[in-house]
């Protein structure tokens, strides 16, 4: 008797026992599907900064990038907005804040405070350096703008001396003291000694009034007179004493007091 396998292709005439076993079903826990990351680029400040530049970010978003994470139960953007609001939404006021202000703000802490202090100091030095490069001593307006930028928003009184050569070129700028002129250790003899070391032919002195009022006090006028007379002994000239406020200045020279 002929085998039925002779009438059909061999592949169709296999013994069922020889057929390959069906793949076993996976009976364990389902494998989690990999989620494709969402495209957050239109939303996250870091990505927008890299793609569109820092001008695309708000002040609060720039601060949020510095903070990195939130604190005090807030997300990082709420922390950034709260910090900025503390300075009246003014980056300029934030730039001139005392270092301990950041550390005492809720949710900031020591590490974030250090970052903010470093960044604000870098920004302030860059602005002062840029203004100094463009400073024209023969232009009273430029000198006053420079001084306003340097000390106008300081929360304490700062005494600054500009040492000039015979052509009124800038030799050096020094902050001599801090506090208030009634308690600040401003010693005319030290300024005169420094002028001799630098071979300065002329000086401009300045200090700020944190109150914003620029009307000179009696102590301001007395110090100006003493320093003017002391510099005359070494053939150096006091060109001006500028009192600096947050938005205005007072010039002794312009007022005819020198």
Swiss-Prot record:
Keywords: Hydrolase, Metal-binding, Metalloprotease, Protease, Zinc. InterPro entries: MPN (IPR037518), RadC_JAB (IPR025657), UPF0758 (IPR001405), UPF0758_CS (IPR020891), UPF0758_N (IPR046778). GO terms for biological process: proteolysis. Residues 13-42 are annotated as: Disordered. Residues 31-42 have a biased composition (Basic residues). The keyword Zinc applies. Zn(2+) binds at residues 207, 209, 220. A motif (JAMM motif) lies at residues 207-220. One of its GO terms (molecular function) is metal ion binding. Gene3D superfamilies: Cytidine Deaminase, domain 2. Pfam families: RadC (PF04002), UPF0758_N (PF20582). Residues 136-258 form the MPN domain. It comes from the Bacteria. Belongs to the UPF0758 family. NCBIfam families: PRK00024.1, radc. This is UPF0758 protein BamMC406_2419.
């Amino acid at each position: 008797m002929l085998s039925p396998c002779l009438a059909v292709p061999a592949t169709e005439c296999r013994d069922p026992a020889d057929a390959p076993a069906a793949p076993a079903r996976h009976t364990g826990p389902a494998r989690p599907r990999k989620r494709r990351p969402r495209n957050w680029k239109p939303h996250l400040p870091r990505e927008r900064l890299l793609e569109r530049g820092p001008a695309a970010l708000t002040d609060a978003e720039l601060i949020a990038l510095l903070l990195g994470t939130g604190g005090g139960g807030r997300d990082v953007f709420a922390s950034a907005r709260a910090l900025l609001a503390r300075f009246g939404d003014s980056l300029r006021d934030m730039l001139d804040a005392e270092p301990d202000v950041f550390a005492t703000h809720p949710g900031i802490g020591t590490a974030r405070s250090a970052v903010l202090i470093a960044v604000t100091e870098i920004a302030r030095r860059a602005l002062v350096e840029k203004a100094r490069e463009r400073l024209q001593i023969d232009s009273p307006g430029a000198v006053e703008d420079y001084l306003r930028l340097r000390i106008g928003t300081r929360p304490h009184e700062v005494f600054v001396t500009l040492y000039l050569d015979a052509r009124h070129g800038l030799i050096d700028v020094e902050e001599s003291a801090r506090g208030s002129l009634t308690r600040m250790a401003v010693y005319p003899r030290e300024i005169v000694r420094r002028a001799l070391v630098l071979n300065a032919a002329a000086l401009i002195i300045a200090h700020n009034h944190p109150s914003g009022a620029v009307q000179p006090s009696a102590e301001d006028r007395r110090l100006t007179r003493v320093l003017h007379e002391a510099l005359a002994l070494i053939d150096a000239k006091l060109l001006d004493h500028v009192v600096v406020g947050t938005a205005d200045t007072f010039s002794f020279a312009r007022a005819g007091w020198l």
